[in-house]
Amino acid sequence: MATTLFRLAGRNAKRHCMRQSTTIAHNLNSTRAFSASALRRYAEPSYEGQGTRLVPTGDDFAPNNDLYGLEALKADGAPRVPPQDHILARKVRHYTVNFGPQHPAAHGVLRLILELKGEEIVRADPHVGLLHRGTEKLCEYRTYLQALPYFDRLDYVSMMTNEQCFALAVEKLLNVEIPERAKWIRTMFAEITRILNHLMSVLSHAMDVGALTPFLWGFEEREKLMEFYERVSGARLHAAYVRPGGVHQDIPLGLLDDIYMWATQFGDRIDETEEMLTDNRIWIDRLRGIGVVSAADALNLSFTGVMLRGSGVPWDIRKSQPYDAYDQVEFDVPVGINGDCYDRYLCRMEEFRQSLRIIHQCLNKMPAGPVRVEDYKISPPPRSAMKENMEALIHHFLLYTKGYAVPPGDTYSAIEAPKGEMGVYVVSDGSERPYRVHIRAPGFAHLGGFDHLSRGHMLADAVAVIGTMDLVFGEVDR
């Protein structure tokens, strides 16, 4: 049985092998020589029997069937006018990137939406408000004295100048004149605060660009100034020292001598920083010609402070509208020429020296006398009087529980803060609490001009532009 099946299988195999093979009829029209150009029917496959068909969505997606450009010629050899190139006519979409809010060079919670063309900044859209705390509204629910510490939290790098601005506004509404010693103390600590701010500004700017050493050197000097803050007010950061009616307390013994000793050696620290940066080739290349703003544009963008003076406008509120003891000191206002980041850096370096000059004059001209107005309805009586006089104790109790009533009216007070013009608009309805407080922060206006300063620069230059603005988002977002 097995043998019979084997024979049948062999015969069937022989029969299949001897069968005539089927030949495929070739179409002579489809036969062509080898060429680089493919036939159009191969480029447009159609599988209608299977329910699928590839349909081109536009002329731009059609295959290039004329590799040698023969179709672009007329019969006489003259070139034809090519149709509109849809790819070139189509708008090119720029790349959008988020800068921050967690970027180390953003100096806080800055969020920038940058529209880039390659690495070139086409448009910059700053988004603010991530540090908004409602400071202006909170002040409406506090007495004038209780509202003062909120100003320390605005620009938390230059604290006492914020307090000074609010105190001047309240004193203008109260129509009081503070003692001379209080004026000189305020002026001296305003310049110490200016040095504190510029140290942070210039040296963190240098660190953002890539120079680490000046940052470490400068913070050693900032530590000494923080000690002066602590000795005069008890707090290193949020001092609440400058108050309506004067200052909180007199300068402790020995502090003026220590400030003098510090001021005599700080000039050498400025020179060391300038040796590291001013003639540094990398520093110059990163700053010169970057963030240029003309004097007219700076005025139109509401720039103040160094951002305005760097463009050649000699505007300083300490000179034009002097307050406290600034009308009794001599100093110069440094002004830039080109309006770029490098000129603004040079202005800040010169302001170090001018602030030292003012501090020396304050130390030499500091008069003796009280540091607060002797009106116990505005400033508290001394501790010794409280322990002996019942009326002084009542004044102290009412001052810190109820506060003092400010006559109805409104006023705007502006000072030359380290970052620019810091202004406070206060409206009083005659009660112990302000009806409205509006804060004019210089950094808010400067950040509004970021698009103007950065447009056309590289992405890496955005860090240099942010650094030269000296932004602190406590005051920008308020």
From Swiss-Prot:
The gene is nuo-49. This is NADH-ubiquinone oxidoreductase 49 kDa subunit, mitochondrial. It is found in: Mitochondrion inner membrane. GO terms for molecular function: 4 iron, 4 sulfur cluster binding; metal ion binding; NAD binding; NADH dehydrogenase (ubiquinone) activity; quinone binding. [4Fe-4S] cluster binds at C341, C347, C362. Coiled coil: none annotated. Its EC number is 7.1.1.2. It comes from Neurospora crassa (strain ATCC 24698 / 74-OR23-1A / CBS 708.71 / DSM 1257 / FGSC 987). GO terms for biological process: mitochondrial electron transport, NADH to ubiquinone. Belongs to the complex I 49 kDa subunit family. It is an enzyme of class 7 (translocase). Core subunit of the mitochondrial membrane respiratory chain NADH dehydrogenase (Complex I) that is believed to belong to the minimal assembly required for catalysis. Complex I functions in the transfer of electrons from NADH to the respiratory chain. The immediate electron acceptor for the enzyme is believed to be ubiquinone. NCBIfam families: NuoD (TIGR01962), PRK06075.1 (NF004739). It is a peripheral membrane protein. GO terms for cellular component: mitochondrial inner membrane; respiratory chain complex I. It catalyses: a ubiquinone + NADH + 5 H(+)(in) = a ubiquinol + NAD(+) + 4 H(+)(out). Binds 1 [4Fe-4S] cluster.
